[in-house]
Amino acid sequence: MGAYKYLQELYKKKQSDAVRFLLRVRCWEYRNLPVCHRASHPTRVDKARRLGYKATQGFVVYRIRVRRGGRKRQVPGGRTGGKPKTHGVNELKPSRNLRSVAEERVGRRCPNLRVLNSYWVNQDSTYKYYEVILVDNSHNAIRNDPRYNWICKPVHKHRELRGLTSAGIKARGLRRKGTHRASKTRPSRQANYKRRNTVVFHRYR
C-alpha cells in the first residue's frame, strides 16, 4: 500500500488514540483562527487528491467552520406573519447539509475562484470544520490543462450556489442512478409528497 492508502485507513478509525489526540489538538488550533481562512496546504492530502486537488499553480484550499445544529428562522422583530401553525422559529431543520453551506460561504468569500469540492476535517460540540478546494479559472496553468479547463466555462460560475457540487447533489437527493429512482425529487421532494398525499374530490357535474 502507498502512503495515501495508510492515511485513508487511519481516518477510518477516528476513535483510535492517535487520531483522537491529533483531532483534539487541531480543533484547538482551528478555534483560534478566523472563521474562514486560507490553508497553506490540505490537512488531509489523500482525501484532497481523491477529490481532484493537485499541488500545482491555480489550486487553493480554504478552511471554514460552520455552526452545528438546526437553523433558526429569520424573523425581523419577531414578526412571523401568517397563521400560528406556521410561527415556528427554533425547531426548523435546514434542507441542505453543512458541507454544502460551507462551500457556499467560501464561494461568496472568493467570487473570483470556482469551487471544485470539499471534505470534512474536524468537529467539536459547537462547530464542524471543512476544507474547500477552489480553482483559479483565470490561471493559465488551469486553462491549458485539459483535465481541469472544463471548470473555466461560464456555465460553472458559482456552481456551489446552484447545488452542482458533490455536497449539493447529495442534498438534492440525486445521488441515485436511473430514471425512476430520482424521479421523486423533481420539481422538489415537498411537491412530490404533496401531490401523492393530497386527496382531491372533483366536483360532480
From Swiss-Prot:
One Gene Ontology biological process: translation
Listed SMART domains: Ribosomal_L15e
GO molecular function, one term: RNA binding
PROSITE patterns, per database record: RIBOSOMAL_L15E
Pfam families tied to this protein: Ribosomal_L15e
UniProt region (Disordered), positions on chain: 70-90, 172-197
GO cellular component annotations of the record: cytosolic large ribosomal subunit; extracellular matrix
UniProt cross-references to InterPro entries, sorted A to Z: Rbsml_eL15_core_dom_sf (IPR024794), Ribosomal_eL15 (IPR000439), Ribosomal_eL15_CS (IPR020925), Ribosomal_uL23/eL15/eS24_sf (IPR012678)
Domain of life according to the entry: Eukaryota
SUPFAM superfamilies named among the record's database cross-references: Ribosomal proteins S24e, L23 and L15e
UniProt keyword list: Ribonucleoprotein, Ribosomal protein
Protein family membership: Belongs to the eukaryotic ribosomal protein eL15 family.
Protein name: Large ribosomal subunit protein eL15
Species for this entry: Dictyostelium discoideum
